[in-house]
Amino acid sequence: MFLRPWSRNFLCSCRGFSVCTPYASIKSASELALKNISELQALQKIQNHTEKLKFFSSKLHNKGEPFTLQLGDLITEHTSVPELNEILDKFSQSNELFTMRFLEKASIIAHKNRSAELARRLRTYAANAMIDLSRVAFVNIFWTLLKTRDKEGIVETIEGQPIAFKVARRIFRRLLVYTSEAGENIEICFFLTNSLFKRLLNNREALSKDEKSELQNLYYDLLLCFSYSYYVPGVKLLLPMLYNGSFKEINRTAIDRSLLALLSTGELEAALELLVYLKNNNIPINDAYLRMMVINFCLANKPTLAVRFCQAWFKQSKMLSSTENLLLIAESLSRASNDFAAISKQMQPFSIESSSFYLPSHRLLMLVALMMKNSSGILHSYAVLKKANAITNKELRIMMQHAMDLRSTEFAEAVLKESEFTLQSNRSQLLMDFVAILFLNKEYTKAFATLEKTFASKIKPSHNIISFSLSLVKRFGTKNDLFFLRRSFKNMGIETLDEIEKNLPPKVVYRCFNY
């Protein structure tokens, strides 16, 4: 090509131009370019918007001369939204005038003025003229709608619009930053994930290796965004993509936060599905999440489901069969029913010898029996555990607590005898429990003797037992009882006795086992 394209419309006027073009055609094209420059300069000299429209219309409807102007020539950086709307109203029937250049310039005005109505009109005119929005026009329209929180407009703009991966990535990146900073637009983020991200995922085979990696990173960033916002619909929308194998690598932070969001909002079914996925893929699960699952079942008054969950998962974590965890379920069971026999029947599938949850279920029943002060239930479960050589210090302290509830020194002595072969540290706790029961039953002489005997065995009384005994003797004992108690403690070297007695509350509670 040997002519210099000095006009922005030169190439448009020379469509089909080739080296074989006749000289007359070349001359005609150059004349059109000169005419376009002349008319454009004339249009730019007009300051009044109405006069500009008149000039443009006169050139448009002049059939005797070729029309060289473009609708975008009417737009300057000073064009207002009402003026642009007037242009659209006047030329709305002429789809051929809506070029990409016009849409780009108009979208800048819409974005600058945050006019969602104008942005939606531009999108509609582009669709009517069958024009795919350029990156500039699309981004301007999209951010205008986003900043004005026009959810429907955003979704309509996305649907049917071919969007390159780089543009989509930029949209999500900026949206994620905007959402995290402002704490808003989480629903718009959800709508875009449901439409645009799904579209990217369905077309991932066409992406390069780096783009696939970026898509995976984007997935986990979206998951984190929804999780930190506790926006459950978003979490539940994204997780199935992980389950069906769309992404091979695991982002533990995103998964943990998702699990926390589901558990915190009581979405037990979705949380359980995620736990099963982690278990099947040999991914370690934090004990805290399993405990939260149990807590949720108990709060929902579904203790049987909590037991079933523990049975299925206790091999994953010893915490599920621990006394602390079983105590939660026991409290839920005792709230649901006052009939221990009915609860025992309910727990029968778990407490039979062939059950994998056999021993933990009897620990559970023992706790329920303790709460209901059912001696036969406690003794039966204790016998089962003893037969299996599964007695721990927790069970002995439960028995001691039951002795305290019954105010039975004989029961406490029997429990103490059972503990003869336990560790010294565990036995010292039980001895203190026994002393507390003696004081509770006003058997002060025996209590003093036991205290001195335990001290001779290098077992020092705890702060709790000192406070408890002082409180009881002060309230129910004689002056002599109080004198002997103080002397016993001083003989044991309790230097802070006066301070403890001075700060003694009106009533001190002692428990062998807290429930």
From Swiss-Prot:
Per the record, what is one GO cellular component?
A: mitochondrial matrix
Q: Name one GO molecular function term.
A: protein-macromolecule adaptor activity
Q: Name one GO biological process term.
A: mitochondrial translational initiation
Q: What name appears for this protein in its UniProt entry?
A: Uncharacterized protein C106.19
Q: Which organism is it from?
A: Schizosaccharomyces pombe (strain 972 / ATCC 24843)
Lineage of the species this protein comes from: Eukaryota, Fungi, Dikarya, Ascomycota, Taphrinomycotina
